[in-house]
Structure formats: structure tokens, C-alpha cells
């Protein structure tokens, strides 16, 4: 379900997978002031496209739907690996958006090798390498679409942030190597436990909440994909789940739907969480000096919270205090330490340029004087040797 609000009118989009369609409708209130009821009015019904781009053998089985600012409708369809299907507001099929990449597994690389050797007919009979389908998506306040891929084996494109052209921004920013969910795969009693990200929520402030189907946990990241918190889990006690299905946020609260328990659990932000989010918000607004205080408070409460060291390092780096920035980056950020060191080195060279110039000039003059003196000494010795040689030859001639 996705709710789009435009000029005070709310349109509800429902992915009706049981009937192979997406329905968009508005809700009107009828009746008197004392007795009112709500009635849905269907606006558009989106069904399987009758277009050559859509494989007619694939059932139109929508699982998720969302709408962007231009009123384009994006639909996740099971068994479609080309990305999300895109429809116009009126229901016309416009193509696909944001397909995943094919993961470079050993089988894929071997198939690519054999295709170089096989004939065209033999290559056609080989099994095609296709990407994993998109599992879920969300859209932020800046109209960027985020997609997640739930896979037991693939590690490619687990989380993507897509621009209007369908390009993954995280790849260009160097975030593609980040690990989302559990950093390590666990093995227990013959079973493999690795994260399967089944849903994503992007809050109004850019915070990313990823829901892990395997462990029942929520992994919360900031807008630069730095891990903030992990909460939830599998179990029967309060705050744990059996089978998680969806995650959403409203304000600072996070809501998780458990399909087996038929319950929604609300996670309220703690005081420590509020301090961390406040520090991130101040830093993103360019208030670096003000961001230092909440980061220092976070470190006071938890000296092992590594993100606070990075936050303080970034704050001091942007203030130009590179020595202090290196001190904080040293604990948990090689890239931050390198940036601070480069800036410190540039400042050191600029502040001491005159001294360096004088030292270099003195060295050059010294080298020149030494070279000149050495050449003169060599010339004198050469002259003396030639004179001595001539005198010896003259003595032999006289004899």
C-alpha cells in the first residue's frame, strides 16, 4: 500500500497480487456530520501490460508499489528481473527502472568464457545469467528511489539509491563496497545464517531502516550508509518477532510488522539515539561546532560508540583543526585520517613555505659553490699533472 498526497487529496495505491493488478483509489466521506462513512472511488487500475517489452509468459504479480513526484507509478513484480515496472498516471506502461546487476559469480565468469569459444547456436543453448529481482523499495523527500534485494546468495546491489536515470548513486560515491545487514555470515548446525534484507524505510531526515528477514532485526543507517543502531530479533519476548514483513517510520518512531504474530511493534527513540540523530542533523546543516557537543555527550555515555569518533573527526576537519581531527579519525576511519593528514600537510607546507624556500635556496647555492670549488680543484690537479708529465717527457728527450 502506498498513499500519495497531492493538493490535499490522498490517493491510495494497493498492490492487489491476488487479482494481478494495482488499484488506485480515493476515499470520500459521505453522510451527515453526526454519521459519516468513508467510500472508496477507483481512479485507475493497472494490469499486465500489453507491450512487447513485457514478457507475456510472466504473470503480473505485483508485490510493492510507490509513486514519485511526477506521478509515475513504480511496481515491483515477482519473477521480473529487469527492475521495477513503470506506469504513467493514466496507466500506460513506460518500461523498467533500476534493474540489478548480474553478480560476477564463478558460474557467470565460466559461462562468459565458454561463450567466447562456442558457436552462436551453442551459446544460445546455454543458461542465461540474469540478475536477482528487486524485493522492495521506498522513496525519500528528494524523490530518490531506494531499492533492496532479498537474496540468500547474492551480495550485489543489496541496497541502491537511484536517480531519475536509474543509476545507483552509491556506486559513484564509493558506497557499493559497504556491507548491509550482518557483516559476517554465520554457520550453525549445518545452516547458513546471512542477512536477507526484505524491506526498506527512508525517514524524513534521510535515516535508512533495513529489515532483515533472517534475523528479524532492523539495521539503521544514516544518509551516508554508516551504521547507527541495530534492534529487534527473533523470539517471543517483547521487541522480538517470528516472521518480519515490513518496516515503516513516522517521526522518530520505527514500526515493524510481524506476519505470524499479526502485530505491529513500535520502537521509540531512546535518549542516546536522540543525541546521535541530533549530532548528525547539525552536521548535515553545516553546524560543525554545534555538532561537537552531542558527539562528545555520546562518547561520554558510550566510549565504544565508533561513529562518535568519526563524527568528531569530521567536525574538527571541517573547522580546520586537522591535528584533533586526526586524533579522532585514528580510532576508526582510515579514509578520514588520510583526508585530515593531507590537509594538515598542505597547511604545514603553506605555513612554512618561506623556510622551505630559504633552505632549498641555501642548498642549491651550497651545491653550486661546492661544485664550482670541486671543478677548480680538479682543474688545478689536472694542470699540475700535465705539467709534471711534460717535465718527465722533456727529461727523457734530453737523455
Predicted regions and their residues:
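Eukaryotic scaffold repeat domains enriched in small/polar residues
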Residues: 1-322, 332, 339-399
Amino acid at each position: 500500500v502506498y498513499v500519495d498526497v497531492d493538493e490535499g487529496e490522498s490517493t491510495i495505491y494497493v498492490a492487489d497480487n491476488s487479482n494481478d493488478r494495482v488499484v488506485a483509489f480515493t476515499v470520500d466521506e459521505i453522510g451527515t456530520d453526526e454519521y459519516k462513512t468513508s467510500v472508496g472511488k477507483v481512479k485507475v487500475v493497472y494490469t499486465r501490460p500489453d507491450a512487447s517489452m513485457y514478457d507475456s509468459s510472466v504473470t503480473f504479480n505485483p508485490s510493492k508499489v510507490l509513486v514519485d513526484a511526477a506521478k509515475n507509478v513504480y511496481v515491483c513484480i515477482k519473477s521480473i528481473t529487469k527492475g521495477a515496472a513503470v506506469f504513467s498516471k493514466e496507466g500506460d506502461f513506460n518500461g523498467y527502472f533500476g534493474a540489478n546487476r548480474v553478480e560476477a559469480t564463478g558460474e557467470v565468469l565460466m559461462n562468459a568464457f565458454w561463450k567466447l569459444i562456442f558457436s552462436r547456436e551453442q551459446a544460445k543453448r546455454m543458461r542465461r545469467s540474469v540478475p536477482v529481482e528487486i524485493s522492495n523499495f521506498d522513496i525519500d523527500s528528494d524523490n530518490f528511489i531506494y531499492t533492496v534485494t532479498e537474496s540468500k546468495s547474492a551480495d550485489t546491489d543489496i541496497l541502491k539509491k537511484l536517480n531519475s536515470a536509474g543509476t545507483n548513486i552509491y556506486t559513484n560515491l564509493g558506497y557499493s563496497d559497504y556491507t548491509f545487514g550482518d557483516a559476517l555470515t554465520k554457520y550453525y548446525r549445518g545452516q547458513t545464517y546471512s542477512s536477507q534484507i526484505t524491506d526498506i524505510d527512508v525517514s524524513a531526515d534521510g535515516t535508512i531502516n533495513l529489515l532483515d528477514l533472517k534475523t528479524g532485526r532492523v539495521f539503521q543507517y544514516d544518509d551516508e550508509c554508516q551504521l547507527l543502531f541495530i534492534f529487534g530479533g527473533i523470539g517471543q519476548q517483547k521487541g522480538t518477532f517470528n516472521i518480519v514483513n515490513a518496516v515503516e517510520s513516522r517521526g522518530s518512531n520505527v514500526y515493524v510488522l510481524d506476519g505470524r504474530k499479526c502485530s505491529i511493534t513500535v520502537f521509540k527513540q531512546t535518549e542516546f539515539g536522540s543525541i546521535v540523530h541530533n549530532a548528525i542533523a547539525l552536521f548535515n546543516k553545516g553546524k560543525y561546532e554545534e555538532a561537537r557537543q552531542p558527539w562528545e555527550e555520546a562518547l561520554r555515555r558510550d566510549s565504544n560508540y565508533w561513529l562518535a569518533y568519526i563524527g568528531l573527526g569530521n567536525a574538527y576537519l571541517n573547522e580546520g583543526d586537522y591535528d584533533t581531527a586526526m586524533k579522532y579519525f585514528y580510532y576508526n576511519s582510515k579514509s578520514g585520517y588520510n583526508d585530515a593528514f593531507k590537509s594538515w600537510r598542505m597547511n604545514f607546507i603553506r605555513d612554512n613555505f618561506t623556510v622551505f624556500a630559504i633552505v632549498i635556496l641555501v642548498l642549491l647555492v651550497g651545491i653550486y659553490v661546492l661544485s664550482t670549488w670541486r671543478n677548480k680543484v680538479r682543474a688545478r690537479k689536472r694542470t699540475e699533472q700535465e705539467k709534471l708529465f711534460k717535465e718527465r717527457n722533456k727529461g727523457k728527450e734530453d737523455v
